[in-house]
């Protein structure tokens, strides 16, 4: 064959291959199973495969765990007990308003242990918009496609004289009614783990595409054939059909926290679409949301990790509002039990998500956060407090008053379509009050903090240093928010002063944050390796850096940049030793730090996640670049063990998303993002204002983690931060990456990011 003929043949083959090659879209890179290989003693995410819409009210998940078990799906499990509508934000908070369904064949079985079927991941498809599993014991294929408040299920049965569909409304008080003339099952569940009013119910409705050949209800485990109503502790229903092999049953399901009638209204989200149309709709929605960040890379594994993290970043906070028959936005209040107008969101802990999840929304999805801010206005009106951990109402979890950060950063980022004055009232109120039944809401110890400048170690308020540090940052947030609102200097002065209260728990002898007694002395004995006690799920090596708004002030306390950098280095150099005596056992966060071989750096928990970026304040940004790449490549992947600790409702995922883009919000509310180094060759951020941010990294091989040079908008750029204004105007970044650090770049005083102590009063 001549060279010309050979070349023509190669081109023809390439053309054929190109014609048949699959075109990948963002959602195709997502694995919803990332983080699901978790257990109580060791978290690799503590996630479940949420089949859902972005910020949807209802999620669906296959269920491997027992009813009420926070570990609802674990990758290592062999059997599925059902398919659950869930509202669970984490296994530690657990679920509410949940119920399950399960197809089966043969004699009807309700007990979840007995009805469970073997399944295999080889016959499982798990995407954000579609889930499929093969129930081997029944020869049944079950598929799910969701909308925000509804879902459609398609069940492919074998030939069976009695093919059944189980509806399990769970225990703690439930109700089910079969409506044969309408091919429907309706009911409600009251199951929850706290944070709900007494009248809480999740009403559900299931509409089948054919008449029932068999009906029964379940009363506390007893199947009552032919009966139509069950109201008891643990209610359920089983409806049956005669099926041919390959026959498909379609079930349309919706729910409401308002009423059964509203659940029927929510069923209209499905319209007249069949299963495949709903599935296609969901796929488009996910591609629209994920496609706001466009990534080009030769590394499929990194693309899978990135988009799997972005998927987790847009699940929570959960929508908790509905549209009534008039098309009005309404919600059942998880705070006072009334049905009221307006938005409501839930299932997020601000202790986690103030750090970078909400800042990500403010960059990429600000219109969603405007709705969330309106929801916070309603939460305050209905309960007298802003939530700190909501699921669905106030929950007693974590510390701090970080709703102030959520509110301030949104407003300072230009979000305005809500009642900001009411939120000002709310954040100020939270500085001088504690919720009467949920002490983690408001400020526990505010009397001491406002008088002494810290929460003392010896007044029976635990995690006191953590509280002091977070209250100080929150006061800074309130100060900035108030300035933007035009509040008087007199009104703002207490917050300005208290923003420096972090100084009051800094021990110059150890250069670490340390518990302080009411009389002013520091606690004795003191171990920087002791977890808990004065800190929250961390130790002094972790919390010393929780001065988000004033790293320069912390540098000054330590005696300068050299000591500051040595202390930062020490976090990685100190062996992963620990003192767990406060807990009396090794909690999973400790174990996750211990096994990662990064010294005392604990990326699996939130308090220290910003720490790597602090080298940019102290003139050694190349260390940020090195440790960012180490953390991204070692602590994250797209497998079931893909996280190095709890994913925490988008926070740990949003860290990866920001870091991959090459910048991170160390101090939400400052209007600045600290630079690291991008992970991908090219990224384009499609902003809601119509502008685009372009990020290009030349010579971006795996070993080239250091920034040799950076150009911003065509000009050399040495600063270690970028402003929000730069981003919103459509910034263009061009990096030249290298395998050796450039120790001349980013070292000038003017290159350092924002610090409060550098601002003139």
Regions found by a protein language model. Give the residues of each.
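Accessory carbohydrate-recognition regions in carbohydrate-active enzymes
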Residues: 22-358, 362-405, 411-469, 477, ...
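Bacterial Sec-dependent N-terminal signal peptides
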Residues: 1-23
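Extracellular attachment/recognition segments
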Residues: 706
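ATP-dependent phospho-/nucleotidyl transfer catalytic cores
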Residues: 474
């Amino acid at each position: 064959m001549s060279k010309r003929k050979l070349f023509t043949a190669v081109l023809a083959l390439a053309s054929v291959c190109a014609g048949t090659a699959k075109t990948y879209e963002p959602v195709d890179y997502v694995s919803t199973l990332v983080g699901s290989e978790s257990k109580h003693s060791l978290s690799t995410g503590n996630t479940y495969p949420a089949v859902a819409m972005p910020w949807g009210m209802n999620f669906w998940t296959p269920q491997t765990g027992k009813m009420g078990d926070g570990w609802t799906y674990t990758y290592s499990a062999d059997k599925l007990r059902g398919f659950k509508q869930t509202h669970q934000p984490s296994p530690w908070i657990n679920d509410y308003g949940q119920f399950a369904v399960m197809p089966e064949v043969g004699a009807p079985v309700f007990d979840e242990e007995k009805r469970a079927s073997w399944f295999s991941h080889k016959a499982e498809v798990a995407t954000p918009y579609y889930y499929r599993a093969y129930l081997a014991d029944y020869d049944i294929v079950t598929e799910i496609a969701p909308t925000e408040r509804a879902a459609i299920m398609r069940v492919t049965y074998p030939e069976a004289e009695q093919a059944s569909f189980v509806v399990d409304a769970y225990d703690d008080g439930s109700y089910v009614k079969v409506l044969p003339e309408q091919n429907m099952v309706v009911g409600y569940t009251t199951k929850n783990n706290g944070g709900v009013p007494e009248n809480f119910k999740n009403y559900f409705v299931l509409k089948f595409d054919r008449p029932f050949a068999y009906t029964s209800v379940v009363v506390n485990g007893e199947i009552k054939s032919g009966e139509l109503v069950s109201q008891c502790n643990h209610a359920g229903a089983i409806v049956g059909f005669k099926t041919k092999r390959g026959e498909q049953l379609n079930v349309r399901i919706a729910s409401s926290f308002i009423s059964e009638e509203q659940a029927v209204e929510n069923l209209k989200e499905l319209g007249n679409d069949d299963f495949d149309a709903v599935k296609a709709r969901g796929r488009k929605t996910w591609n629209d949301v994920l496609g706001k960040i466009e990534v080009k890379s030769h590394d499929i594994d990194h693309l899978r990790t990135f988009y799997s993290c972005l998927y987790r970043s847009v699940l929570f906070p959960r929508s908790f509002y509905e549209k009534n028959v008039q098309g009005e936005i309404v919600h059942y209040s998880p705070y006072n039990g009334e049905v009221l107008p307006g938005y409501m969101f839930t299932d997020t802990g601000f202790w986690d998500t103030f750090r970078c999840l909400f800042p990500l929304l403010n960059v990429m999805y600000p219109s969603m956060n405007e709705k969330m801010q309106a929801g916070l206005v309603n939460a305050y009106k209905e309960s007298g407090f802003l939530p700190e951990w909501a699921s669905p109402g106030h929950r007693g979890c974590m510390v701090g008053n970080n709703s102030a950060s959520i509110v301030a950063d949104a407003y300072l980022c230009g979000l305005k379509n809500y009642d900001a004055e009411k939120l000002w009232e709310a954040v100020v109120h939270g500085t001088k009050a504690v919720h009467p039944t949920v002490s983690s809401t408001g400020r526990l110890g505010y009397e001491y903090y406002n008088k002494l400048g810290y929460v003392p170690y010896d007044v029976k308020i635990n995690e006191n240093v953590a509280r002091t540090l977070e209250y100080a940052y929150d006061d800074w947030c309130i100060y900035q928010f108030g300035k933007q609102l035009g509040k008087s200097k007199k009104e703002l002065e207490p917050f300005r002063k208290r923003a420096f209260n972090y100084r009051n728990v800094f021990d110059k002898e150890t250069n670490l944050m340390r518990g302080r007694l009411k009389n002013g002395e520091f606690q004795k004995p003191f171990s920087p390796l002791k977890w808990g006690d004065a800190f929250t799920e961390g130790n002094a090596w972790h919390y010393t850096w929780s001065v988000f708004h004033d790293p320069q002030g912390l540098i000054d306390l330590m005696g300068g940049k050299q000591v500051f950098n040595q202390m930062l280095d020490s976090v990685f150099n100190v062996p992963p030793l620990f003192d767990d005596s406060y807990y009396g056992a090794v909690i999973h966060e400790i174990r996750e730090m211990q096994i990662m071989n990064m010294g005392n750096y604990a990326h699996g928990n939130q308090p220290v996640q910003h720490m790597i970026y602090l080298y940019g304040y102290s003139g050694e940004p190349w260390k940020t670049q090195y440790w960012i790449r180490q953390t991204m490549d070692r602590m994250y992947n797209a497998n079931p063990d893909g996280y190095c600790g709890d994913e925490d409702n988008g926070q740990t995922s949003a860290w990866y998303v920001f870091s991959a883009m090459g910048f991170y919000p160390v101090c939400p509310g400052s209007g600045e993002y600290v630079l690291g180094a991008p992970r991908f060759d090219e990224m384009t951020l499609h902003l809601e204002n119509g502008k685009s941010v372009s990020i290009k990294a030349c010579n971006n091989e795996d070993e080239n983690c250091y920034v040799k040079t950076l150009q911003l908008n065509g000009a050399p750029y040495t600063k270690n931060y970028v402003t929000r204004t730069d981003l919103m105007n459509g910034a263009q970044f061009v990096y030249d990456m290298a395998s050796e650090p450039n120790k001349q770049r980013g070292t000038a005083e003017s290159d350092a990011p924002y610090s409060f102590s550098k601002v003139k009063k």
